[in-house]
Swiss-Prot record:
Organism of provenance: Schizosaccharomyces pombe (strain 972 / ATCC 24843)
Major place of residence: cytoplasm
One annotated GO biological process: exocytosis
Gene name tied to this protein: pof6
Protein name, per record: F-box protein pof6
Pfam families: F-box-like (PF12937), Sec10_HB (PF07393)
Positions with biased composition (Basic and acidic residues): 113-122
Length: 872
C-alpha cells in the first residue's frame, strides 16, 4: 500500500468513528424518540410544565422554543388566522432566511400546507430592515388590572396577535400574562363579586368580552380532569352572566325601555349569539299578540230575512289594518333596540302574527262547516284579497304564506269540486225538467183520452141498466115513446155544453207541458190520436232541447270561480302554476258540462224525436217542422260554441298556448267542437232522411198514374211547364236549403247540400224507373229535370251538376219517337252523355220505362248488343 493511500484510509476510518460517536451522543441526549414526537408531547402539556421542560437541557430549551407549539395553542384559542399568517409570510419572504429544519419538524405546525418553505419557517431570522416594521416583541411584564392601560391590554390581547409564525411564542406569552391570572382567579372564585373579571371590569360590555376571552383561553389547556374542572367553572360563571343579562333584557321588554333593551341585546348578541334573547323576545311578543287580538268568528257572519249568510268584510278589513299597524310598529321598535332586527322581524311576522291569523282562519272555516262550500270559497278568496295589502310592507309575503298555505290546497280542490257539483246539478235539473214536461204532456193527452173513455163506458153502462127492464117487458117498436125519450136523454147528455165550449182550454193546461194553442182546440179522444199528439208535441219541443239561459248560468258560475282563483295569482311561481292548473281544470269541466252534459244529451234527444217522425204524410205548410226545429237547435248550439270561443279568448288565452295540443284545456276545447260537429252532422243526416223521404212522398202523391204515359199529343200545349210534383219538391227543398244559411258553418252547409243533392238524384232515378213514359211524358220529364238542374245550380255545388245534367240526357231518351229506335240505341250507347252517372247497363234498364219498349226493343238491342252483325 502506498503511503498516500494509507493516509486516506486512516482519515476515512477516523471520520467514521467520529460520526458514530456523534450519533451515540445525540441518542444519549434525546433518547430513542424523534424530535417530532417530542414536539407533539410539548404541545399537549400545560404552559407551566412546558417552562419546566425548557430548563432540563439545552436541547429541550431549543425544542420548547419551537413556534409550532404556540401556533397550535393559539389555534385552539381561535386567535390564529392561517390564511393571514401565510399572506404575511409571503410578503416578508424576501427579508427572511430559510430555517434549516427537517421535513419532520414541518409537520408539527398542522397548517395543512404543501409549501415547505412556509412550514419550515419555525425559527427564521429577519433582516434589520424587516425588524423595523414589526411591533415590539419584548417579553411582556405582568398586567396591572387596576389601571386603564392594563384593562385595555386584556380587552385587546387576542385581537393583537401578530399572526406571524416567527413571533407565535411571544404572542402566546402576552396572552398568558394577560389572561392566566384572571382565569385562575375566576375558576376558584366562590361568588360573582370578588373575581377580577367582575371587579376590575364594571360594564357588561367589558365583562362579556373578558368572559369570552377566558373561555377561548381555557380551550388551549390540555385535556384532563383537573383542567376540565376549571373550564367548567368558567362556563358556569358565563351562564350566570348570560342569565343576568337576560333578566335585564326581560325587564326592558316589560318596561319598553329602549336604552336597556339596546344595551343588553348587544351584550348578549356579542357574548352568546342571538338565540337566547331572540327566543325571549318572541315569547313575550306572542303573549302580547294574543292579548291584542280578540277574534270572534261568530260575529263575522250576517244572516238576512231569507236565511242567507253573508260575510261582514268590515271586520276582516279592520283585522288586516290592525295587523299592518302592529307589524310596522314592531319593525320600528326592533330596529331601534336590536343589533340585527331581521332576526326577530321574520319570525315575528311568520310565526307569531302568521300563526295567530292562521288559527283565526281555521276557526272561521270550522264554523262555516263542510256543507257551506260556497261560503268557504268566498271567505278564503276575499280574505286573501284583503291580505294582499301585506305585500307592500316588509315580511308581508311570509305572513301571507303562513296564514293561507294550509288553506290554498283545500281551496283549489274545493273550488273545482264545487263548480263540478253545481254545474252538473244545473244540467241534471234541466234534463229532469225536460223529462217532466214530456211526461206531463203525455199524461195530459192520455188523461183526456181516459176521461172520454170513462165517460163513454159510464154512459154505455147507464144505458144498459136503465133500459134493461124496458127491453125485457116491453116489445120494442119505432113508436115506443119511452125508448125514444131515454135515447134522447142519453144523446143530450153526450152533447157538449155550449157554455163550457166557450171556455179557453189553455186555462186548464199545466205550465210544464208542450201543447200549442191550436192543438188545445182539438184534444185527442182516442189512444191513437193521443200517441200522434204526444209525438207532435215532442217534435215541437226539439228547439227547446238547448237552453242559452242554462249555458249562461254555467258560464257565469265558471267566471265567478275563475275570479276567485285569480285572487291568488302573482304571489309566487309555484302558487301561480297551481292556480293556472285550477283555471284549466275549471275550463275543462265547463266544456264537459256543456258538451257531454247538455249539448250531447239535447242532440241525442232531438235526434231520437226526429227519428220517430213520419215524413210520409202531408203537411199544412210546405215545411217539415221537425227539421226546421232541428236547424234552430243547431243555431243555438252554434251560439253556445261562440260563447265558449269568446270565453276562451277572454279568460283562458293569457294562461294557454292556443296551438299547444298537450294542454288539457286546448285538447278539451277541440273535443267540444268535434262533439258539436259530429252531433250536428248526425242530426242533419237524420234531417236529410226526413227531407228526402218527404220529397219521395210528394213525388208519389202529386204524380198521377198516367201523367207521363198520356199519348194525347193534341192536349200538350206549346209551353210545357214542370209538373206539380217537381214544383212541390223544389219548393220544399229550396225552403229548407235557404233556412239553413246562417245557422251552420260553411263546411257543414257544403256537406249538407251535397248529401241532399245526391239523395235527390237517387230518388229521381228510382222515380223515373217506376213510371212509364210516352213521348209527351218525356217532354214533361225534361221540363222537370230542367227545374231540378236549376235548383242544384242555385246551391253552388259544381260537383252535383253533372249528375242532374245526366238526368236531362235521360229525358231525351223518352222524347225520341219509337220510329227512330236505332237513334235511341245510339243515344243510349253514347258514353259521353251518361258516363258521369250511369253505365250503359243502367241506361238500358231505364229504357224499359218507355211505354213502347216492347216495340223498339229489338231495334235497340241490335244497336246496343250488335245483333245486326252477320258473318260473311
Amino acid at each position: 500500500m502506498k503511503p498516500s493511500e494509507a493516509r486516506e484510509h486512516a482519515i476515512r476510518k477516523i471520520k467514521e468513528y467520529l460520526e458514530r460517536r456523534h450519533k451515540q451522543q445525540f441518542k444519549a441526549l434525546f433518547g430513542c424518540l424523534t424530535i417530532n414526537i417530542y414536539l407533539k408531547i410539548f404541545t399537549l402539556i400545560s404552559t407551566p410544565d412546558l417552562c419546566n421542560c425548557r430548563l432540563v437541557c439545552r436541547k429541550f430549551q431549543q425544542l420548547c422554543d419551537y413556534n409550532s407549539i404556540y401556533v397550535k395553542k393559539l389555534l385552539l384559542m381561535n386567535a390564529w388566522d392561517v390564511t393571514l399568517s401565510r399572506k404575511l409570510y409571503y410578503e416578508s419572504q424576501d427579508g427572511m432566511s430559510q430555517a434549516n429544519m427537517s421535513s419532520n419538524t414541518s409537520k408539527g405546525f398542522h397548517l395543512q400546507s404543501s409549501d415547505k418553505k412556509y412550514a419550515d419557517s419555525d425559527r427564521p431570522k429577519l433582516s434589520s430592515s424587516s425588524l423595523l416594521s414589526l411591533p415590539d416583541q419584548k417579553i411582556p411584564f405582568p398586567v396591572d388590572y387596576s389601571t386603564v392601560q392594563g384593562k385595555q391590554v386584556v380587552l385587546t390581547v387576542l385581537d393583537c396577535v401578530s399572526q406571524r409564525v416567527e413571533f407565535a411564542r411571544l404572542d402566546y406569552i402576552k396572552v398568558w400574562r394577560a389572561l392566566a391570572p384572571i382565569y385562575r382567579n375566576l375558576a376558584y372564585a366562590s361568588n360573582t363579586i370578588d373575581p377580577i373579571a367582575f371587579s376590575a371590569f364594571r360594564t357588561p360590555e367589558e365583562q362579556s368580552k373578558v368572559l369570552k376571552y377566558l373561555i377561548r383561553f381555557g380551550n388551549s389547556y390540555p385535556y384532563g380532569t383537573y383542567r376540565q374542572a376549571m373550564q367548567n367553572a368558567i362556563l358556569d360563571m358565563a351562564s350566570l352572566f348570560e342569565q343576568a343579562c337576560l333578566d335585564e333584557f326581560e325587564l326592558g321588554l316589560h318596561s319598553r325601555n329602549l336604552d336597556l333593551l339596546r344595551k343588553f341585546s348587544h351584550v348578549l348578541h356579542d357574548f352568546s349569539g342571538p338565540n337566547a334573547y331572540v327566543s325571549m323576545y318572541l315569547a313575550k311578543q306572542t303573549d302580547f299578540v294574543r292579548s291584542f287580538f280578540h277574534f270572534d268568528p261568530y260575529s263575522l257572519f250576517i244572516s238576512n230575512n231569507l236565511e242567507e249568510i253573508h260575510i261582514n268584510w268590515n271586520i276582516l278589513e279592520s283585522v288586516v289594518n290592525d295587523t299592518i299597524k302592529l307589524l310596522e310598529s314592531e319593525s320600528k321598535f326592533s330596529e331601534a333596540t336590536l343589533p340585527e332586527p331581521e332576526l326577530v322581524q321574520v319570525p315575528y311576522a311568520k310565526d307569531i302574527l302568521g300563526n295567530s291569523l292562521k288559527d283565526y282562519v281555521i276557526s272561521i272555516c270550522e264554523h262555516i262547516g263542510e256543507e257551506e262550500t260556497e261560503l268557504f270559497l268566498v271567505f278564503i278568496s276575499g280574505f286573501y284579497g284583503l291580505c294582499k295589502k301585506f305585500f307592500s310592507i316588509p315580511n308581508g309575503p311570509a305572513l301571507v304564506d303562513t296564514i293561507f298555505q294550509p288553506q290554498i290546497d283545500i281551496f283549489i280542490s274545493q273550488e273545482l269540486h264545487y263548480f263540478k257539483t253545481v254545474g252538473w246539478s244545473l244540467v241534471d235539473q234541466w234534463d229532469q225538467k225536460l223529462e217532466e214536461k214530456e211526461d206531463a204532456t203525455e199524461c195530459f193527452f192520455y188523461k183526456n183520452v181516459s176521461q172520454n173513455t170513462a165517460k163513454n163506458n159510464f154512459l154505455e153502462t147507464f144505458k144498459n141498466v136503465m133500459l134493461l127492464p124496458v127491453s125485457l117487458f116491453t116489445i120494442p117498436s119505432e113508436n115506443n115513446s119511452a125508448s125514444n125519450l131515454a135515447e134522447k136523454a142519453i144523446e143530450q147528455k153526450e152533447e157538449e155544453d155550449p157554455e163550457l165550449s166557450k171556455l179557453d182550454a189553455a186555462r186548464f193546461v199545466p205550465a210544464n207541458i208542450y201543447v200549442s194553442k191550436d192543438r188545445l182546440k182539438h184534444l185527442p179522444t182516442t189512444e191513437l190520436a193521443a200517441q200522434a199528439a204526444v209525438l207532435d208535441s215532442k217534435l215541437e219541443g226539439i228547439s227547446t232541447m238547448f237552453s242559452l239561459e242554462l249555458a249562461l248560468k254555467i258560464v257565469h258560475l265558471c267566471k265567478v270561480s275563475l275570479a276567485r282563483a285569480k285572487v291568488f295569482m302573482g304571489t309566487s311561481v309555484p302558487q301561480d302554476d297551481d292556480i293556472k292548473g285550477l283555471s284549466k281544470d275549471l275550463f275543462v269541466q265547463l266544456l264537459r258540462e256543456l258538451g257531454q252534459g247538455h249539448l250531447k244529451h239535447g242532440f241525442d234527444r232531438a235526434i231520437e224525436h226526429l227519428s220517430s217522425f213520419d215524413p210520409r204524410r202531408d203537411f199544412s205548410s210546405n215545411t217539415v217542422e221537425p227539421v226546421v226545429k232541428f236547424l234552430e237547435l243547431i243555431n243555438v248550439g252554434d251560439m253556445i260554441q261562440q260563447m265558449m270561443d269568446s270565453f276562451f279568448n277572454e279568460e283562458m288565452s293569457p294562461i294557454c298556448v292556443k296551438d299547444d295540443m298537450f294542454d288539457p284545456a286546448i285538447a278539451e276545447k277541440k273535443k267540444f267542437e268535434q262533439l258539436l260537429d259530429e252531433r250536428a252532422a248526425f242530426g242533419l243526416h237524420k234531417g236529410i232522411n226526413v227531407l228526402i223521404e218527404h220529397a219521395d212522398f210528394l213525388l208519389e202523391t202529386k204524380t198521377p198514374m198516367n201523367l207521363f204515359s198520356d199519348q194525347t199529343i193534341g192536349s200538350i200545349t206549346n209551353t210545357i211547364e214542370p209538373t206539380a210534383a217537381a214544383k212541390n219538391v223544389v219548393q220544399f227543398l229550396g225552403f229548407h236549403m235557404r233556412i239553413l244559411v246562417g245557422r251552420a258553418d260553411h263546411e257543414i252547409l257544403d256537406v249538407f247540400y251535397k248529401e241532399v243533392g245526391m239523395r235527390l238524384f237517387d230518388s229521381l232515378t228510382r222515380y223515373i224507373k217506376s213510371h212509364k213514359f210516352s213521348v209527351d211524358g218525356g217532354l214533361k220529364l225534361l221540363s222537370d229535370c230542367n227545374l231540378y238542374y236549376e235548383f242544384i245550380h242555385s246551391l253552388h255545388q259544381s260537383s252535383l251538376l253533372p249528375y242532374f245534367k245526366t238526368l236531362k240526357e235521360i229525358a231525351h231518351l223518352f222524347i225520341i219517337d219509337g220510329k227512330n229506335a236505332e237513334e235511341i240505341g245510339k243515344l243510349a250507347t253514347d258514353t259521353s252523355r251518361f258516363s258521369s252517372a250511369f253505365h250503359t247497363e243502367e241506361v238500358y234498364e231505364i229504357l224499359h220505362s218507355r211505354i213502347d219498349w216492347l216495340n223498339i226493343k229489338y231495334e235497340v238491342d241490335k244497336v246496343i248488343h250488335g245483333l245486326a252483325c252477320c258473318i260473311m
